[in-house]
Amino acid sequence: MKTIERSVKGGYRISTQDTVYETKVVVNAAGVYADEFHNMVSEKKLHITPRKGEYFLLDKTTGAHVSHTVFTLPGKYGKGVLVTPTVHGNLLIGPTATDVEQKEGTDTTMQGMEEICKKAQHSVKEIPFRQVITGFAGLRAHEDGHEFVIQEVEDAPGFIDCAGIESPGLTSAPAIGRLAAEIVRNVLELKENPAFCKTRKGILNPAELTAKERNELIRKNPAYGRIVCRCEMISEGEILDSIHRPLGATTMDGIKRRTRAGMGRCQAGFCTPKTMEILERELKIRQEEITKNGAGSEMIVGRNKDGKI
């Protein structure tokens, strides 16, 4: 998105790289960019600082090292480095908390890794760091007043901020969504749709079935018998479901987030080619168009020899 401006028709005019949208309401949930969009329409300025948090993810063999989340004492920048078992059996350690200037600054650093190792061992001993399978970083949107900003902007009717969402933002997300929906309903004077379905069917997990049920599933749909991701035992059937459901996956990370394909010990080293073939076939696109997580993260950047990819 490039700009947001008031529309002569009322509402807002949003210009993107590809097109222009006219809308009566904008919900500004742009994370570390929320201040930039807010400041395009309001005289009361908002400032957000990207706060980087780095993590380690350990192999599933380490998940039982602790039985519950272990926190250190909270500090100025958050709750400190924690050690927690995940619901899928891994061990997650982090985050750090470092203010940065770059709104895309999700690179990991040697300094961050050393900080995680040092601080985590204050609360948990003998952490098997040799079992780390990946490290990553994310950015929290720190608002100067250290507050969640969830409201219709006073001098920009119809522009709704959901900004400055730090910890416990994940826990708060369902309530934030309901509050934002209520504000939108009031602005547009909407009436409840009695036919609206509030729930959606999740992606079938064959691992939760009995052997008899799994065999019957594979008999009806052989795609569930073709394992694509061996680390997490994710089948082609699950990947197809993730692609073809409403708001389905269109990227490699989209599939990973919905199915865990690529989240295991080899970090997609084995299953990437097959997953790309499935995306190519199902979305009817070329493999050169497939991205890891949107524009600028293309999986294939060129050819190293003649012939088909």
Describe each model-derived feature in a short phrase.
Residues 2-5, 133:
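Conserved positions in beta-strands of structured domains
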Residues 4-94, 98-109, 118, 124-127, ...:
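Flavin-dependent oxidoreductases
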Residues 36, 40, 183-187, 278-282:
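Active-site catalytic microenvironments for nucleophilic, acid-base chemistry
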Residues 45-46, 127-131, 192, 285-292:
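Short, surface-exposed acidic
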Residues 78, 87-88, 99-227, 234-247, ...:
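C-terminal catalytic lobe of FAD-dependent flavoproteins
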Residues 104, 235-246, 269-287:
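Iron-sulfur (Fe-S) cluster-binding segments and ferredoxin-like electron-carrier domains
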Residues 256-272, 289-309:
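Short Fe-S-cluster ligation motifs
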